[in-house]
Amino acid sequence: MADVSYRLGIDIGGTFTDLSLMNEATGELTELKTPTVTDDPAQGIINGLKLLKERGVDLSKIQYLVHGMTIGLNTLLQRKGADLALFVTEGFQDILSLQRLRLPIPYDFNSQLPEPLIPRKHVYPISERLIHDGSIKKPLQLQQLDDAVQQVISKKLAGIVISFLHSYQNPVHELQAKAYIHHHYPQLEVLTSTELWPQMREYERTVMSVVNLYIQPKVKQYLQTLKSRLKEEGVPISPYITQSNGGLMDAESAATSPVKTLFSGPAAGVIGAARIATSANEPNLITFDVGGTSADISIIQNGQPTMAQSNQLSGFPIILPSVAMYSIGAGGGSVAWLDQGGLLKAGPESVGSQPGPASYGKGKKAALTDAFLICGYLNQDRFAGGHLQLQRSAAEIAFQPIADQLHKTVEQAADQLIQVAVANMYTELSNVMEQQGFDPRDFSLLAFGGAGPVVANFLAREIHAKNVVVPPSPGTLCALGALTADFIHDAVLSKKICLQDYTMDELKQDYEMLSRKATDWFSQQNIQHIKQTSILLLADARYQGQAFEIELPLSVDWLKQEQDVYHLIEAFHNLHERQYGHRDDQANIEFTHLRVRVIGETPPLPFSPVDESSGQPLIPQSYRRIFIEEKEYEASVYNRSTLSLGAVVKGPAIIEQDDTTTLILPKWAGSIDHSGNLVISREAALHGN
């Protein structure tokens, strides 16, 4: 017993906090869900640790802890961050107010630009000026800087963001201003725009820096509280935090750069999904994560998550590399309601975990989870591993007014809500696939999250996906995915240059400088779990005159060879044609940013092998009356833990496990593959017809 050690993954969602514990010696997984404590998220984790204690886990044996969190995200969405000041180049005080002068909804003249996180009265002009190449036109005026700081102090603001024009080319004035403030006013938090991501486009760089300092106090406080409580519970280590790019960093880095954690939890789920893609021999996957609050998808192509170089959050651009994710609709807590025309709607309002759906016994609003229960998909005695008793009568009472207005029975109204939610998901998923140029028929649908496997078969049928893949622990995949993540750091150099004027020697020198910068980050981390490192080289490129770029990967080995830039030019033409269907061989090609990604690979998890089938016929543990698309069926009910390699379950069927429930539709069948995944296919495909 003395040699036992554990790895623990934690993910805090809007409704549940998930824990995934792996025994490093045996590969045995222990997974559980506990309600998220909205006002005190760390307490949800502590509640989960206490449940692990009750199962006989020695918390002092946890040697590796990874945490996906939404503290920064919630702080931004709820606009409960710090009161800040912004110092800008003289003449640019309106940068946060003007934004990009684009309506959020181009065809709606009433749509509003997001309210700046820093009001204009707290934006201070500073006399200084760099020109576009980074050379100094006007020196920084320290007296004016000092006067502005005095006003910040008099208004009792918590910190200052410094964002000067063209600082990405030369940060000298930003650094000079920060050093002055730190020396004379050490009580103030100060952040320069080039510290996080020195990329051109002034508005985007400024906004991201503002968001970082805006959410920083809440994230710092949370991490300090969490580390303290972990220590009190006997956990001997500090957590690593998942980043939006799918990588890990230590808690100290997360406290300094919390903007890198905004998409932390969902990104961990996609990383876990990428591992499933490899194990299931399904290189092309649509990940379908349905939790209590929302449904999100991501695309895995050739076993790798697709990445985005920027994201929009509450109308604010976040120009950091992140796993590309799209919110496509309702979650289990989405509220049922009728619009003015009497049409049934699902969401976007969610009941969350407090008070939760009506079937939790606390709330009064009908939600999607209540519909699942009424239609017979859920076992009221086994929800969340049996830790939460559902009340069907409460769900029916909540649905009764809706059913009356629709002139339907309660079951018909619940069934209709499920179909409305699926239709919403289908519409939005189809749009995403079309915009990215993907054919859903070439992809399988990977369902996870607490509610994903319940509706995945409906959605796969609608989009004509190859099949549905449900991993062994779908309800806690984000927590497990965090355990499989590597340490990742990205670095960027803004360099607007015509590719035809770029020599290979210059290109190599720039990438070598960036690689050193990214690699140095690893030496600053408290990391003891890296197996080896690898480097990816990327460039943002476009045809001259275009407004935005596409990502061009460069081979590290290719750079070492004696090649000229014309090989890069041809590679860009081919990439542009593949993504957009056309190319312009006569146009000049422009590089705007060079980027390097360094990956510190962590040791693989020692997963337990799947048991072979006994050869005995499968016997359902029970049967249940269910309601699907206005028809009644008698569904076979199975326990997921009794299904072994090669086992086949024909629909209609329900497969129950502690963290989720999977619904298999009529004319579909599920089988267990060699990695323990449940693969749901059309019966015709299963029999090779």
Question: Model-found features: residue ranges?
Answer:
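N-terminal glycine/serine-rich phosphate-binding loop of ATP-dependent small-molecule kinases
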Residues: M1-A85, I131, K138-I160, P171-S193, ...
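Conserved phosphate-binding loops in N-terminal lobes of ATP-dependent enzymes
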Residues: G9-I12, F16-S20, E28-E31, P35-P41, ...
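C-terminal, non-catalytic interaction/recognition modules in large multi-subunit enzymes and RNPs
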Residues: I12, Q143-Q151, E282, G292, ...
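Glycine-rich phosphate-binding loop of actin/hexokinase-like ATP-binding domains
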Residues: L19, T30-D39, A85-G91, S111-P114, ...
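Short, ordered loop/turn segments at secondary-structure junctions
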Residues: E24, T89-F92, L165-S167, E195-L196, ...
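Glycine-rich beta-strand-to-loop/alpha-helix junction loops that act as flexible
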Residues: M69, F164-L165, S193-E195, S244-N245, ...
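Terminal amphipathic helices with adjacent charged low-complexity linkers/tails
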Residues: S163-S209, L554-V556, V596-S613, L678-L686
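Charge-patterned, long linear interaction tracts outside catalytic cores
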Residues: E233-A280, A518-W558
